[in-house]
Structure formats: structure tokens, C-alpha cells
């Protein structure tokens, strides 16, 4: 009989304990699975697209994801997430109406600071409704979440995490790296958000960058965060904490940017780049679109889309675009809603919805005309397509500033651009091979990373869950004051030390000068009187030559030409010399 292998003997020995091992393994699996709540912003559906993609990936890892959404907000049902509804100020229809009203304000030039405050007020009012909803808060606490994901566009997420007493991480769906993250941000080469600057600045640009930075910090500190602090005070949220503390309390910052797009800058261990969540290979086009694209032949086609959030363009801009596009030899497919432009070319196809990623991945595409939305730019970069960008609001300007600086596209200002400038920009990115070469190079850099952005996101979420918030990644910057951070205490010590040294040196100098003057005065007057005692002037004299208690002598030889007295006071005078 052949010998029984050792591992078989081990299995036979463990057979009676198999149920216990199975139970232990199941317990380990359950412990690794987590319950995560996401607080998306009350508008901007593009942000929700990203969170749905992340939720699906988390579901594959065994995690549960819950979206906190207002009643009436439309979202496709899925087994990958579930919904916790609440009565908010917006549903899908009213949210879209509000956003489109702001778009009309932009095109009419009425988007002033008051309009921006109105948007901020809507966010804070919705937060007030959430925090004040006791039934909702009770239901959320009973869920016993392991982690909360905060979109910084919805600052209420910090307040909700504090109320629930749960760990939280920031998942920024926009191109946003605020100073509140805590990472060093030298203004000499780190452009502030909305500054429209690159990492190479001249003197005037650095001045502008500094001014924008100070305005941003003022706005966050005195306009944004206090609104949410008042909400916490109103509803007696305990323990009391400032919004700054809550922002700094994030376990991790996952930012939707990428080394291929962002300018190099200092960062921290708890800040990771996960830009490009929605990027993926192109799928086959629907038959009608495939036939239309194939009909473009060697000229190719141009894709035009301003994103899901921009449904209507002003008539002036739409006509400029239509006229410029009509002059191109390429075919044009344009995602468009509203009234048809009056000068639309025969080469242009209007469509209300299109498979943007699949069109960008088609081999016959020549260029992309976009608003510079971050999701669109990452899809464009992924497929290596040159772009002409017309930013409209938000982070569109910063995104397109980077695209242009990287040599992948051209930025145009919708307020000042002409139809000719738009046409020339499109012709340039289509015919100048450097734009496509640079776009393809950035595509290689973007893809040459450890895993897809979705997988990296899931990895980091698992990481902070495994390590109970990963406090070891947090720098000490979160526990020191601004006074210490900017070394103002050191500057004060040096200033006081320099002042003390100045006064000590000044006092010593004054004393030395005073003593020197006194000694010099004594020497000078002794010489004038011509009196020495044992070769040393005794200092007892008068200007008329009288010496107290001594006989007055005439010393004619003391007077030389010019009348200057010369007294050799190195020895005593003899009577013969005085005679």
C-alpha cells in the first residue's frame, strides 16, 4: 500500500473541526465587509455617475453602499447600492431647472456674487433639513455605518459624519485641491483653484495667485464654513466642533485628478489621486452611428458635447459654433438640445444623447469640442484625442488651463471668442500633429499606473477600513495652529532677539563713545594748559594758564608758528627748561 501524503493526513485530522473552521472563515469575511454611506451633492448628476461606478466596485468586494438622496431624485435601481431617501429642497426636475437657470445667468452675464451666494444658500438649507430630520438621523444611526464618503461640494457630509460618529473620507469628484487639505502649497508654483494659472508664473501672475488664494481662504473661513457651524449650533450637535476641525478630521482625501493632468506639487500620505473613474475602452457603436462615422472616410469626424449639465446654449454661442463647424471638411456630431441653430451646416448631425466614450475611442475621430468637464477630459485623455475647450463654470477653467499647458488642446473664452477663432482652433488641433501626439503621450502616462482608478479607489477605501481610519497617514499639520505652521512664533522670537541685540549694542556703543569723548577732552585740555605732573597731565587747569596752588610760569617755547601748543608730557620739566 503506498504511503498516504502528509497533507491528506492533516486533512483527515482536521475533519472533525471543519464546521468550526468554516464558521471562522465566514466570520472573517463578514468582518471585512463594510457598510458605507455616500452623501452626494444635491445637484450635478455627473458626480452621481462617479459614485455609482465606485459603488459597483465596492459591491464586488462584498461591501454595502447606501446613497443619501432627496425624494424624487431619479437614479436607476441596482443591486449594487440602496437608497436612503429624505425630503429635501430638490428633486431631479427642480434641481435641473435650478441648474439651467444658473446657466442662463452665465450666458447673460448675470452670474454675480449674489448668484453664487444663492447656490451656497440652497446647499446649506438642504443641510438644515437633513440635520433637523430626527427620524432620518435615527435611521442612519441604526445602520451603524463603517465609513462615510464626503463629496466636498456637499459640505453637509462632514456634519452628518460627526452626528453619526463614523469615520469619513473625502472623495472629491472635481479638480479641487484646497489648502484645507493641509498639504504645502507654495504660491510661487502651485496655482490656486480658479486662478487660471500654470505652475510657471511671472511676478504679476504670482501676485494674482496670492490674491486669489487669500480671497479663497476668506470665502471658506467666513462665508462657507460658518453656515454649517450655525446649523450645528441650531440643532445642538454635540460634542461641539468647528467645521475646520471636521474638514481636517478626514481619514483620507481621494481627489479626481491625475499625474498626467495635474501640475506636480507637494502632497501628503493621506492624499491620493484617483482621476479617471469613468474611463474605459470603447464599445461598438450603434449601427446608425457606425454607418454615419464610416461615411466620414479619411476626413474623419469631430465630436461636440458640453456635458449633461449644460442642456441649452445661448443663441449667440450656438450660432457661432454652428457656423464654425459648418466650415470644417470633417463630419460633426453634436450633442444638442433646444432650438436648431439657423446656420447649421450639412456636415453636422444634432443628437440629444450620444455614447461619448465610444465615439472618443473610435479610430476616425479627429478632435473633441468640449466645455472642459473633468469626466469628459479624462475620457478624452484616455483615448488620446486633442480637444478645444470652451469652459463655462466651476472647475472647467482650471481643467482646460491644464489641458492647454500640457499641449493637448486649446482653451477659448466664450465671452470673447469669434467664429473665426473657433474655426482656427479646431483646424489647428486637427492638422497640427503635435496635439494628437501630446494627447497620446498623456494617455500613456495616465494608464501607466498600478491599476485602474476605480481599483485604486477601492484599495484605499479598504485600506482605511483595515487600519481603522489609517491615522498613521495623517501629518501633524492637522494638530498645530496657523501660528506654528507659518513659523510666526519663530519669527517673533527672532524679532525680539534682534531688538534686544540692537538695544544692547546701541547702549554699549553710546557708553563707549561717551567715555572716549571724556578721555579725549581731558587729554586736549591738559595739552592746552601745558601742565604735567610727573609726565602725566593732572587735569587741574584753567584756560588762562593758571594752575591751582602752583606758581604761574611763562613758557615761551610752547608757542610755535601757528600758535599751536606742543607739550612733551612724557617727562617732568626741569627748572632750567622753565627758566
Ranges and model annotations:
Residues 6, 12-234, 261, 275-283, ...:
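Glycosyltransferase specificity loop/lid
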Residues 143, 245-248, 266-269, 346, ...:
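Structured loop/turn residues at beta-strand edges in well-structured enzyme cores
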Residues 154, 237-246:
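Short acidic low-complexity segments
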Residues 246-261:
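Long, low-complexity segments enriched in small/aliphatic residues
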Residues 252-256, 269-279:
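Donor nucleotide-sugar binding/catalytic pocket of nucleotide-sugar-dependent glycosyltransferases
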Residues 552, 569-570:
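C-terminal membrane-proximal segments flanking the terminal transmembrane helix
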Residues 559-562:
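Intrinsic disorder/low-complexity segments
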Amino acid at each position: 500500500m503506498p504511503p498516504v501524503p502528509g497533507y491528506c493526513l492533516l486533512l483527515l485530522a482536521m475533519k472533525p473541526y471543519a464546521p468550526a473552521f468554516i464558521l471562522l472563515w465566514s466570520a472573517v469575511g463578514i468582518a471585512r465587509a463594510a457598510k458605507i454611506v455616500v452623501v452626494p451633492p444635491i445637484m450635478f448628476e455627473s458626480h452621481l455617475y462617479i459614485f455609482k461606478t465606485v459603488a459597483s466596485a465596492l459591491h464586488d468586494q462584498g461591501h454595502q453602499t447606501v446613497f443619501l438622496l432627496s425624494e424624487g431624485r431619479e437614479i436607476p435601481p441596482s443591486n449594487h447600492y440602496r437608497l436612503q431617501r429624505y425630503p429635501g429642497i430638490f428633486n431631479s426636475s427642480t434641481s435641473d431647472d435650478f441648474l439651467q437657470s444658473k446657466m442662463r445667468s452665465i450666458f447673460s452675464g448675470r452670474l454675480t456674487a449674489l448668484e453664487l451666494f444663492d447656490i451656497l444658500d440652497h446647499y446649506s438649507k438642504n443641510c438644515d433639513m437633513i440635520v433637523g430630520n430626527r427620524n432620518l438621523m435615527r435611521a442612519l444611526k441604526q445602520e451603524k455605518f463603517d465609513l462615510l464618503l464626503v463629496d466636498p461640494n456637499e459640505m453637509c457630509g462632514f456634519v452628518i459624519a460627526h452626528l453619526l460618529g463614523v469615520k469619513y473620507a473625502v472623495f472629491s469628484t472635481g479638480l479641487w485641491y484646497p489648502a484645507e487639505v493641509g498639504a504645502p502649497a507654495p504660491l510661487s508654483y502651485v496655482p490656486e483653484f480658479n486662478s487660471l494659472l500654470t505652475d510657471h508664473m511671472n511676478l504679476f501672475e504670482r501676485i494674482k495667485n496670492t490674491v486669489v488664494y487669500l480671497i479663497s481662504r476668506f470665502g471658506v473661513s467666513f462665508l462657507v464654513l460658518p453656515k454649517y457651524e450655525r446649523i450645528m449650533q441650531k440643532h445642538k450637535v454635540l460634542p461641539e466642533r468647528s467645521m475646520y476641525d471636521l474638514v481636517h478630521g478626514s481619514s483620507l482625501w481621494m481627489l479626481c485628478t491625475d499625474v498626467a493632468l495635474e501640475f506636480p506639487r507637494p502632497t501628503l500620505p493621506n492624499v491620493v489621486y484617483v482621476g479617471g473613474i469613468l474611463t474605459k475602452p470603447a464599445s461598438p457603436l450603434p449601427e446608425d452611428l457606425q454607418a454615419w462615422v464610416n461615411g466620414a472616410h479619411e476626413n474623419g469626424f469631430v465630436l461636440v458635447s458640453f456635458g449633461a449639465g449644460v442642456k441649452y446654449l445661448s443663441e449667440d454661442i450656438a450660432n457661432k459654433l454652428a457656423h464654425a463647424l459648418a466650415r470644417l471638411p470633417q463630419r460633426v456630431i453634436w450633442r444638442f438640445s433646444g432650438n436648431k441653430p439657423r446656420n447649421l451646416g450639412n456636415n453636422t448631425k444634432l443628437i440629444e444623447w450620444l455614447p461619448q466614450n465610444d465615439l472618443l475611442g473610435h479610430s476616425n475621430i479627429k478632435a473633441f469640442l468640449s466645455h472642459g468637464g473633468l469626466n469628459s477630459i479624462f475620457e478624452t485623455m484616455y483615448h488620446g484625442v486633442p480637444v478645444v475647450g470652451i469652459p463655462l463654470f466651476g472647475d472647467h477653467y482650471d481643467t482646460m488651463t491644464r489641458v492647454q499647458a500640457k499641449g493637448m488642446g486649446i482653451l477659448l473664452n466664450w465671452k470673447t471668442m469669434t467664429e473665426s477663432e473657433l474655426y482656427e482652433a479646431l483646424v489647428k488641433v486637427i492638422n497640427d500633429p503635435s496635439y494628437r501626439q501630446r494627447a497620446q503621450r498623456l494617455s500613456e502616462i495616465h494608464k501607466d499606473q498600478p491599476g485602474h482608478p476605480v481599483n485604486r479607489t477601492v484599495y484605499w477605501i479598504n485600506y482605511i477600513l483595515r487600519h481603522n481610519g489609517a491615522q498613521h497617514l495623517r501629518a501633524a499639520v492637522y494638530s498645530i495652529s496657523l501660528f506654528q505652521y507659518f513659523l510666526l512664533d519663530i519669527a517673533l522670537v527672532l524679532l525680539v532677539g534682534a531688538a534686544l541685540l540692537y538695544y544692547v549694542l546701541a547702549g554699549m556703543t553710546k557708553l563707549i563713545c561717551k567715555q572716549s569723548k571724556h578721555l579725549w577732552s581731558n587729554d586736549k585740555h591738559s595739552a592746552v594748559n601745558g601742565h604735567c605732573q610727573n609726565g602725566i597731565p593732572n587735569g587741574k587747569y584753567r584756560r588762562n594758564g593758571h594752575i591751582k596752588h602752583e606758581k604761574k610760569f611763562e613758557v615761551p617755547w610752547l608757542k610755535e608758528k601757528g600758535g599751536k601748543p606742543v607739550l612733551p608730557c612724557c617727562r617732568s620739566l626741569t627748572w632750567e627748561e622753565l627758566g
